[in-house]
Amino acid sequence: MLLLVPEINLTPQLEERVRSHFADESVVVLNSDLPDAQRARSWLAVHEGRARILVGTRMAALASFRQLALIVVDEEHDLSYKGGDGARYSARDLSVKRAQSLGIPVILGSATPSLESWSRARSGSYRLLTLSHKAVSKAEPPRLRLVDTRTLKKGEVLSEEVKEAIGATLQKHEQVLVYINRRGFSPVLMCPSCGWKSACPHCSAFMVFHKDTRSLVCHHCGYTQRVPARCPGCGAADILPVGIGTQRIEEEIGKLWPDARRLRIDRDNFKTKRSTDKAFQDVHEGKVDILIGTQMIAKGHDFKKVSLVVILNIDSQLISTDVRARERAFATMMQVSGRAGRAGLKSEVLVETAFPDDEIFTFLAHQDYQGFADQMLKIRKRDGAPPFVYQALLTSEQKELPQALELLRHAVETGLEIQSKLPDGGGVAIYDPVPMTIVKVANRNRAQLLIEGRTHRELLQFLRAWVQVIGPCSGGALTLEVDPQRY
């Protein structure tokens, strides 16, 4: 049996449950955080049949089994299953294909399934199984309260409503979870005198201010530098942080509740499996009063004592132009909300937003994933967006942007020639090359080209013919990704 989880920090909890339930079975773990020797032992154990249960992350989808009989993909909607570098396969889709070829069942589990999976379930391609009750029978859904950020005072980090709710929760000796998917202290430093901003010299992005190390860090290329003593633009002494991240929330909470035991969990301060496991164990054992974190704390964890969840900075996803942004925003809010009241405690979720009238919050208040998903599918169908079309993304990275765009224009010309020889253009549409949203990363300029097909078969047929022509001519400067999740 293969059990997949999207992130390494979800492994210990699932491993413990599997070992307790299948006490007589040998269970092994496979993920990128393990030493090479231990990964090899786990791989060989399932390959030789000495272990019959494998718990792992994306890489485990490729493990060799003597007689695989069942695949379970937990949190199947999670973006972590689709790699952004190297071999850009989806561990979820690979698992489905592997199960089909072996004639075995595959279970895709999620409280917020991807719209692709939900569409297949609605059409009958997948069998839909719904849990009729919660693991704790007396558990009630958390009450949703929206905090209109348009009423916040200038420079205010947390609203009065959030402060009052946190204070009341601490008085009850229950735990608070504060979610913000932004690391660092603030996403940018700015000079109010001349407008200078902490731009990365190697990327078309800003460097994030990390106050604990007094450094500016680019989260795209990793470039790091010390915070300048004065503005590099005009020499002014006052350089101010703009926006909030996990470190700023942690500092503000420390000022407001200095006696509260607080813990920040993100990739900056927990970089190893051992330290992360210890941190989550402290939360489970009640040694933490206020937990602050990013996606690392948003899903899968069974926090028994959390009765208040605070969600910050969700608006960036609500107004994004990414076709999947609202789907991911709703999934994030549902998943984070699900950390509250898991042991039957009366719970509440506070969301800070400038768009309290957005219909997405009505669905969230009723925990109505089905209603939200069905509405989104209607919109996607109307707009001709996935899962009603199938996409591929061709990207080019060059020293200069014109070179990257020119390489893609040549690929377009080649594609149009192939299309002209196919009935109805092969059922494929080729769009114009455009610069990527973040154009430059690590001194490489990036451009992309979107290809859409009416069916998966038509898209793949075209891509096979296309790659045979453009592949040898690209010199390795092109990357093709089928079913892209990031644009």
Regions found by a protein language model. Give the residues of each.
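Inter-lobe coupling/hinge segments of SF2-like helicase ATPases
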Residues: M1-L405, R409, E417, D424, ...
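Conserved short beta-strand edge segments in small beta-sheet-based binding/regulatory domains
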Residues: K421-A429, V469-P484
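Short edge beta-strands and adjacent turn/loop segments
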Residues: A429-K440
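Short amphipathic alpha-helices in soluble, non-transmembrane regions
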Residues: L407-E413, Q461-V469
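Short, flexible active-site recognition loops that position polar ligands and cofactors
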Residues: E452
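Basic/aromatic recognition patch in beta-strand/loop cores that engages polyanionic ligands
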Residues: A442-N445
